[in-house]
A protein has these predicted regions:
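A detector for small-residue-rich transmembrane helices and their helix-helix packing motifs
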Residues: 2-248
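Conserved polar/disulfide-associated segments of primarily extracytoplasmic proteins
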Residues: 267-370, 375-379, 404-405
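Surface-exposed amphipathic alpha-helical segments
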Residues: 263-266, 367-410
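Register position in tetratricopeptide repeats
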Residues: 427, 461-462, 495, 525-532
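Helix-start (N-cap) detector for alpha-helical repeat units in TPR-like alpha-solenoids
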Residues: 415-416, 449-450, 483-484, 517-518
Length: 536
């Protein structure tokens, strides 16, 4: 009944002492006025859930759009406000109903027992503590006012224990609520999809606040207590956010590639077998990164692979692994990790809505590294995350090169390990470094044609054309019918700018191995170049 008929509590109140649950305790309170703050909060919770349902089914994308806590959006996109808005959202009606009922019971009792500003500060501090626990444990999506409810229960438990001498047993007895709290926690830990860390954070905040909260009949200490609670919660939450904001360096030893990633991004292999990472969110909030090494066979600038990706994967209007392509730009020159690269952008309609895509093609000798980033258009702050990832790409020494160096050192004077080391260096775009071990291998095994071919290619790719042509000629002497030696002669003539002579050499190589598809394609390409050239 409101207003309350009695405002005074004493141990001598009528009735025998008896243990009551928290739900029963609310109705018998006689402190303070109507619990307006609790009633307003409950009304807001119901109203927001009703508005969300009126807008459509309350799925994951809807919750994200309305402000659910999602670790990647809080940490990566800087949307810290989600740590507040998540409390006002609920998955479904049973979730909402349970929270509102317990909030009306425990929250009303606490609001009438304590000063309203202390109660409001408890709600704010508990909300932050709940999200700190949730974020510290998992970056997943979380919603609900359960943490506030646990905080109210925890504060009532401690207050009931501290002031049991002045509070009649029929009005409040902390031991009565302990089994209920334990049952709720047990249900949470044994259920799927329950934010137990958030619940525990709220409960601990309430228990701690209960140590400092005082009933209305105690002297008023002003704003010191409520401000202190909120400041402490802000500091703790800020520490958790800062700790989750630390990036990590992900290194692929096989590729010799290092990329900085937000701490909570998860590694996986996508449907195309590529090394991939994502922020762990499905649908609307999903951001991804994938890397793949493409064996090009020839050194280049990555433009061939960029256009192939544009024409085969990002076909306008056609579906792709990342979504339906709406718009794609032409490849442009870029720099990644100190290397020249090709970059293109695309706009897609992904599973969660409009999505941006950026693909980078970074040549490394006979390989091209394809780095693909996608991020949701709904969260433009993710562009800064992608830019940072690109800026911190580093190219390290791949494991295959380290192993080749180690073998060459372990067996000094052996031509095989030196030949292998030189070949790896050349294929990784280090022809100048490849010359020395290949030259030594040729000296140790002069009749080995493959080594001479590798040496010729290393000279030519290092822009030492005449030395490369000399090495190609010597390879032809030791292997007159070896297609590799003949092909080295083709490369020599191309380096000299003599396309016609290169075609003659290529025809010779084709006679030796007419079934070689690579030589056939090269001959076709050279004939096309000659036909397109102006006649003199």
């Amino acid at each position: 009944m409101y207003p309350p008929q009695k405002t005074r509590l004493s141990p001598e109140e009528e009735g025998q002492p008896r243990l009551l649950s928290i739900g029963q305790s609310a109705g018998g309170m006689r402190l303070g006025g109507a619990p307006w703050l609790t009633l307003i909060l409950a009304t807001v919770l119901v109203g927001i859930h009703g508005a969300a349902r009126a807008a459509g089914p309350v799925g994951l994308d809807t919750l994200l759009r309305w402000g659910a806590k999602a670790g990647p959006l809080v940490v990566d996109a800087g949307q810290v406000w989600r740590l507040v808005t998540a409390h006002f959202l609920h998955r479904d009606f049973p979730h909402l109903a349970l929270n509102v009922l317990v909030l009306l019971a425990a929250g009303s009792g606490l609001e009438r027992l304590c000063r309203r500003r202390d109660y409001a500060a408890l709600l704010v501090a508990a909300g932050l503590a709940t999200m700190a626990g949730s974020l510290g444990s998992s970056g997943g999506v979380s919603v609900g006012a359960s943490g506030l409810v646990y905080a109210c229960v925890g504060a009532l438990l401690v207050l009931g224990r501290r002031h049991r001498a002045k509070l009649p047993a029929r009005w409040m007895s902390s031991e009565a609520a302990v089994p209920t709290v334990l049952v709720f926690l047990w249900m949470g830990w044994t259920s799927v999809g329950v934010d137990n860390a958030g619940h525990l954070g709220g409960l601990l905040a309430g228990l701690l606040a209960g140590v400092f909260l005082e009933p209305r009949w105690h002297p008023d200490t002003g704003w010191l207590r409520p401000v202190g609670m909120v400041v402490a919660a802000v500091v703790v939450t800020g520490g958790v956010v800062a700790e989750r904001s630390v990036w990590r360096m992900e290194r692929d030893d096989g590729f010799g590639l290092s990329v900085a990633l937000p701490r909570d991004w998860r590694g996986d292999v996508d449907g195309q077998g590529r090394r991939a990472f994502s922020n762990g969110l499905p649908g609307r909030g999903r951001a991804t990164f994938s890397a793949e090494a493409i064996e090009a066979g020839e050194p280049g600038d990555g433009s061939v692979q960029a256009r192939q990706f544009q024409q085969e994967v990002l076909v306008q209007g056609a579906p792709s692994p990342e979504g339906r392509t709406l718009k794609v730009t032409e490849p442009v020159a870029a720099r990644v990790g100190g290397r020249s690269a090709q970059r293109l952008h695309a706009e897609l309609e992904g599973p969660g809505g409009p999505t941006h895509l950026m693909a980078l093609f970074v040549p490394r000798g006979e390989w091209v590294y394809r780095l693909v980033f996608t991020w949701p258009a709904a969260y433009p702050a993710y562009r800064e995350v992608v830019d940072r990832m690109v800026a911190e790409v580093r190219f390290d020494e791949p494991s295959v090169l380290r192993e080749a160096r180690a073998r060459a050192l372990l067996v000094p004077g052996a031509p095989g390990p030196l030949r292998a080391l030189g070949g790896v260096l050349r294929r990784l775009g280090l022809p100048k470094e490849a010359v020395a071990p290949l030259s030594e291998s040729v000296r140790l095994a002069p009749a080995h044609v493959e080594t001479r071919v590798e040496l010729a290619r290393a000279f030519l790719e290092a822009s030492r054309v005449e030395e490369g042509c000399h090495a190609a000629a010597e390879a032809r002497v030791y292997g007159p019918w070896d297609t590799g030696a003949l092909e080295a002669g083709v490369r020599c003539e191309l380096s000299r700018g003599n396309v016609e002579r290169a075609l003659e050499r290529l025809v010779e190589a084709r006679r030796v191995d007419p079934q070689d598809a690579r030589l056939r394609a090269a001959e076709l390409a050279l004939r096309t170049v000659l036909e397109a050239a102006p006649h003199r």
